Amino acid sequence: MRNECKHIVAVAALAMAGLMAAASAQAQVSAQGDSTIVVEKPNYVTIALETTVNKPVADVWKRIGGYCTISEWLQIAAGCKILSGTDNEVGAVRSVGGEVLVGKTQYSYTYTQTVRAGRPYNLYHGTIEARPLTATTTKLIYTLIYDNSMLPDDAAREKDKASRTAVFTRALSNMKTLAEGGTLPPPPNQPARGQ
């Protein structure tokens, strides 16, 4: 009888330990959040654009590589301000799209757009890079990646990609013009100054 009691107590203790371990593991999973993927079938799109600039890489980057210089080459009338963080440093947030600087090298940076309430998150990231080709020429590369799976169909996805490609092709052309010391034409759909 005494041995039976010891056996029952031992089994009960093991069962209790097992239950406590399971509860602890479940609590850890809950603390880490749900691991369910939000976008079941993402459709990642990459747009890679490039142009050659007739200036040395250091001169090109000095002219167009500032994080808020986007307002010049994208011709944003409202301009650009750093909302938080330090300008040109990882973690800086600019007023253009609420974009966060998430990576940088001597002649490149990568940014992302933040999640917005009520809007599907498309994981949008952009990278601007300047690479020396020769001592006097530079290749500018602008790469975008984003998920367009939330768009209704292939036609909408193609239209979206074509629109982004047009905007950033113009932006890259504007960067080249500025880096080479030129003056930008008026933005599309806006009259020239003085008209």
Role assignments for model-derived ranges:
Residues 1-12:
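Bacterial N-terminal signal peptides that target proteins for export
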Residues 11-21:
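Bacterial N-terminal signal peptides
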Residues 23-81, 194-195:
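Hydrophobic ligand-binding cavity/cleft-lining segments
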Residues 52, 69-72, 79-125, 174-189, ...:
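Glycine-rich portal/gate segments that line the openings of hydrophobic small-molecule binding cavities
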Residues 54-58, 101-107, 129-139:
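A short, structured loop/turn motif at beta-sheet edges
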Residues 58, 62, 155, 159, ...:
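Surface-exposed, polar/charged faces of alpha-helical domains
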Residues 58, 62-68, 166-173, 177:
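Solvent-exposed, polar/charged alpha-helical surfaces in well-ordered, non-transmembrane soluble domains
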Residues 116-170, 188:
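Beta-strand/loop substructures that line and gate deep hydrophobic ligand-binding cavities in soluble
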